[in-house]
Regions:
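Short amphipathic alpha-helix used as the core "switch/output" element in two-component signaling
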Residues: 60-71
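Alpha4 helix (beta4-alpha4-beta5 surface) of REC/receiver domains from two-component response regulators
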Residues: 61, 82-97
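Two-component/phosphorelay signaling modules centered on CheY-like receiver
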Residues: 10-28
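C-terminal output helix
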Residues: 103-113
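Acidic, metal-coordinating helix/loop segments flanking the phosphotransfer/catalytic sites
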Residues: 29-47, 88
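Conserved acidic carboxylate
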Residues: 7
């Protein structure tokens, strides 16, 4: 399985890639919405994993852009923003699920597996 992970925090990007690669998945990690759209346009992914805030801006425009580019691939927001409005907005933009940081590696793997394996 191939995952596009969009996260502006380098430590979080590295840790998440380590966890997901340990689960046997291929991870392409980028640090901006622009890089995410370019990467998604040039390759197929099984899941998009998005932080809610990238460089001081929300990723809702990215979520909508990914949804237009690829209407079927699941989108999972993985963010420290835990207000109900954050979750509602992400889902309204086309995401299938929202997971709040921090969580255990097992919870992240389980959330991804649920979206990609049924």
């Amino acid at each position: 399985m191939r995952i596009l992970h969009v996260e502006d925090d380098e430590d979080t990007r590295t840790l998440v890639a380590f966890v997901l690669q340990g689960a046997g998945w291929d991870v392409v990690a980028v640090d901006s919405a622009k890089a995410a759209m370019e990467t998604a346009a040039n390759g197929a992914f099984d899941l998009y994993l998005l932080d809610n805030w990238i460089g001081g801006d929300t990723e809702h425009a990215l979520c909508r852009g990914l949804r237009c580019l690829d209407p079927k691939t699941p989108i999972l927001f993985y963010s420290g923003a835990a207000f109900p409005m954050d979750v509602e907005t992400a889902l309204a933009c086309g995401a299938q699920a929202y997971l709040t940081k921090p969580c255990t590696p097992e919870a992240l793997i389980e959330a991804i597996a649920k979206l990609t394996c049924g």
